[in-house]
Amino acid sequence: MSTAITVSHIERNPELLGQTVVVIGGSAGIGLETARRASVEGAKLILTGRSPERLERAASGVHALSSSAFDATDPAQLEQFFRDLPTSIDHIMVTAGRPYYGRLIDMDIAHARRVLDEHFSLFIEVARNAANKVKAGGTLIFMGGTGGRRPGIGFGIASTVTVALPALTANLALELAPVRVNLIAAGFVDTQLSASLLGDELENRRSQLRAKLPIRRVVQPADVAALAVHIMTNTALTGATYDVDGGQQFVAA
């Protein structure tokens, strides 16, 4: 005697339906992919970026509620942006800023200060301005990295930022509670920024990573975006650092 089993289709509501997500640095790469993922989950999007033309294309592509072109590392412009935001924001992701590589002993100290200030001050300024804008249970998500955990010539500034951001994140999570604060630490991600940094060496780097990474493929912006949206929707997550590097930190890659 056989028993027929009927499998019914269970509809799932979008996890960010009706929620407002701000992506600072949302015109390309990880930021734009996160915006796409959040849009699929029903979020209303507000994007920022430096390039007006690129930002306009990105905002149109994800049907953003609004967009604002400015330099997020400029405290005055950042403060004005937050002042103009609606009072009810659910999530903010910050992907602005870029890595800096160079030998410490050859580095102009004034430039080194600017690079460090760009990373730390940006996150602190975002947190300060967002404190009265983000709903309880919402989250700030910052982007960091895993590559600087392994010492190497030319990685001095990157390493300093890498090890400091988790502590900054944890302390902000306590200060801003019940708003949640989390950090995503990525390794190599196959973005336009990576292509611009590597130039003709990009394909060699991809091949090297495919051979050495435990996952046997290169991490894509969609991988990071999936993690970002998970952090937004899981309200138990705060003060933590989440690695998404395909195991890069465990191998010589």
Where do the protein language model's features map onto the residues?
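Conserved glycine-rich cofactor-binding loop
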Residues: 27-28
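Rossmann-fold cofactor-recognition segment
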Residues: 61-76
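Conserved NAD(P)H cofactor-binding loop of Rossmann-fold oxidoreductase domains
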Residues: 93-102, 246-247
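Substrate-binding pocket helix/loop in short-chain dehydrogenase/reductase
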Residues: 103-104, 111-116, 205, 209
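Catalytic loop of short-chain dehydrogenase/reductase
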Residues: 115-116, 122-125, 139-177, 188-189
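Conserved Rossmann-fold SDR core element
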Residues: 166, 175-190, 194, 237-244
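A glycine/serine/threonine-rich, flexible loop-to-helix segment
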Residues: 189-212, 253
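C-terminal substrate-recognition "lid" of short-chain dehydrogenase/reductases
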Residues: 217-244, 249
